Amino acid sequence: MKLIRTVAAVAAGCYLVAATVLALVGLHDHAAPADVIVVPGNTVRPDGTPSERLGARLDAAVSLFNERLAPTIFVSGGVGEEGHDEAAAMARYLVAHGVPASAIVQDPLGFDTAATAANVATYLRTNKLHSALVATQYFHVARTTLALERHGVSVTGSRHARYVEGRDMYSLAREVIGYTLYLATL
């Protein structure tokens, strides 16, 4: 019984350390010029507008774009439960916030982080480009960066979305598992 408690305590400690590292990585904004800014999709409301969480990701991308750190914003997402194309909703939001439509690339096939990374890599290779900035929630930065790098994309930095909600603790815990799986499989 003592061995089980010891193993459980060590496992819990490792999990907490991993969650802390992922959070700190995501909260450390740094950005250098890149070819594109990547914004992974998230919930779109039933009325077709981005959720507050997704809007915060897009606001981070607009900030990077306005700082002229990349000439293009790559928005990626699938069709969510609400029946809306996340990439199209994100593009509309960006245009409404001053980003020219010509500076937006829509990827409607970004059903998850791995698919988004693969699609970004294909876009960059096709256009003889190679680098990206990441704009997403702090807990998602490390896994998004890992996925992009595993697909050959040079990630020059990130900016986390300035939006916090109660489910972030669940999301951070989930990211520990997701990051570990990506390390093992991508």
Residue ranges and their predicted role:
Residues 3-6, 58, 175:
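Hydrophobic alpha-helical segments, especially transmembrane helices
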Residues 23-173:
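A structural signal for short, hydrophobic/glycine-enriched beta-strand patches
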Residues 14, 92, 178-181:
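Intrinsically disordered, low-complexity N-terminal regions enriched in serine/proline/glycine
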Residues 12, 64, 150, 181-182:
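Enrichment for repetitive, rod-forming helical segments
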Residues 1-35:
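N-terminal membrane-anchoring alpha-helices
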Residues 168-186:
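A transmembrane-helix-recognition feature enriched in membrane-embedded lipid enzymes
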